[in-house]
């Protein structure tokens, strides 16, 4: 009986540690920081990023840092839709140091990993995986980062699995990007992170 009770206590203590945490509350940008002049706002419970008058890069980063985690989110691209999800990243002004899991129009390597202000493309998905993207519809992306390994999925399709020492040394927040050039609008919902 003591072993059973101890097992139950261990499970109850561990559950909150592996529970999903919402990154977006559906009503405001509490817990986030805006970088740049591009537009980030809430519309009918959805998080929206949209090109502003400067047509520059813009970022929305979490106030908290996340090292090892499993992130799921949904996005819907409108217009050009070029965006991304940064991991273990820091932002100064509109310069981000870190790694982006690409969110882009068809044929532009959604799910691949790009290192900003560094080595550029680290890995792109195989071309046939591009059909997993549903332009103009809701898409589900999953990103798992543990140590020096990153994996991404798009609508349950495995996109990449990559190991990199530099990523393993990274520290920082999760950030959403709006690309420069103007004419971009992306809607986001159900951003859930599980710290590991």
Predicted regions and their residues:
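Sec-dependent N-terminal signal peptides
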Residues: 4-15
């Amino acid at each position: 009986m003591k072993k059973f009770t101890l097992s139950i206590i261990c499970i109850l203590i561990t559950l909150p540690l592996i529970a999903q945490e919402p990154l977006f509350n559906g009503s405001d940008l509490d817990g986030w920081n805006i970088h740049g002049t591009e537009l980030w706002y809430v519309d009918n419970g959805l998080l929206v990023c949209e090109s502003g008058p400067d047509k520059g890069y813009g970022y929305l980063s979490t106030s908290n840092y996340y090292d090892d985690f499993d992130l799921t989110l949904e996005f819907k691209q409108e217009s050009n839709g070029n965006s991304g999800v940064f991991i273990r990243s820091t932002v100064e002004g509109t310069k981000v140091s870190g790694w982006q899991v690409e969110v882009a129009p068809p044929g532009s390597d959604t799910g691949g990993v790009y290192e900003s202000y560094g080595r550029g493309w680290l890995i792109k998905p195989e071309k046939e995986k591009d059909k997993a993207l549903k332009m103009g519809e809701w898409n589900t992306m999953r990103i798992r980062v543990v140590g020096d390994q990153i994996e991404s999925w798009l609508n349950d399709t495995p996109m990449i699995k990559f190991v990199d020492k530099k990523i393993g040394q990274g520290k920082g927040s999760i950030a959403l990007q709006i690309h420069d050039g103007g004419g971009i609008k992306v809607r986001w919902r159900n951003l859930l992170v599980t710290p590991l």
